[in-house]
Amino acid sequence: MINNKDEALIKAFGARVRELRKQKLLSMEKLAELSEIDYRQLSYVELGDTNPTISTASAIAKGLGLPLKELFDF
């Protein structure tokens, strides 16, 4: 069960991923390809509709060409 505090954190993480993707001028499709994850999975992450695993977060960071810790700078 996800409580309100966790939900806010998941949404903030998704917003950070979207912000970084847009800074890099990447489409969701391109970032998903670079991250080697499904486009729908990336969409759910950005919308804050899923709690991503550490491996998913790591894949997204790799796709963005950033260290994993950058995704948590929010």
Regions found by a protein language model. Give the residues of each.
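A short, Lys/Arg-rich alpha-helix, primarily the initiator
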Residues: 1-23
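Short basic helix-loop element that most often maps to the first helix and adjoining turn
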Residues: 15-32, 59
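Conserved hydrophobic/aromatic packing and binding residues within compact polymer-binding modules
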Residues: 17, 31-32, 42-45, 71
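Recognition helix of helix-turn-helix/homeodomain-like DNA-binding domains
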Residues: 36-50
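Short, basic-rich loop-to-helix N-cap that marks the start of a DNA-contacting helix
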Residues: 49-62
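Short C-terminal boundary/hinge segments that cap the last helix of small helical domains
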Residues: 65-74
